[in-house]
């Protein structure tokens, strides 16, 4: 809040049931950032401010970020032709109006990897080709049915399966690493090949003194990107498995290079489900790993209700990322209702 008014354009930080004379603790994810302009924490009931429940944020805790260097949009799991691509069009228009320099997508632009779907993707991004490039890493849906068709992929996305881009104003490095195959039922059908991982290792070593943003679709087990049930069991399967050599090699790179911020996707889980698993959206294993960020789905975010996975094609989620000299600020965004999620704003 600011001066007793809810911060414009943001969701509540939390919604809780208060009982008189009872203490209540509201957990906050450790990477949570105080939005710029916020001066207070305030409680509201039915839209009305409770004046006895206002906390002034100390001046030294308020956001002082300095000059913004650039911004980019970050989304995942577009799954064209879901919703006829309208969610994708709306997101790109929003990113353009916001002033994003480019957009990163962490996989699954096509629902079944067909040429027709890739053609539709190309048509949607065409108006932004010069002013706001769209970069994408292939996901499992893009690579199904015999593996990624690299010729078609490069033709319609404009980029190879793996590539890097340097942001000119900062020297920051963006690496995009595409999935190799789906399904992954044998040793010859791997999410990533060892050749890809060796290429990635070369890039990370080369740019170890730079800020690096990595896009790769499938998250690692027991890190970020998944929701857990009450017994602590994962409810979304991941075949990038710890019993595979390529997974181990990739995981070691995520441990070694803490200058990396890795954007994954794949599970579609909504931002709010971090209430089930604190590590769902952002995770670093208390410093064991680089910073890992999970992008929810732009077109079919998934909810988890009464132990069941629910597809919600009426919603649409992603990130605005603002980059400063000393900070990267991620703000989860609700494209359907046009607001930032205060509980999914991270540094």
PLM regions: where:
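Extended active-site neighborhood of metal-dependent phosphoesterases/phosphodiesterases
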Residues: 115-207, 237, 249-256, 272-300, ...
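Active-site neighborhood of phospho(di)ester-bond hydrolases with catalytic His/Asp-centered motifs
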Residues: 74-76, 102-108, 133-140, 177, ...
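Active-site-proximal segments of metal-dependent phosphoesterases and phosphodiesterases across multiple
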Residues: 189-191, 207-264
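N-terminal active-site segment of His-dependent metallophosphoesterases
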Residues: 56-119
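Surface-exposed, short loops/turns at beta-strand junctions within beta-sandwich domains
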Residues: 30-37
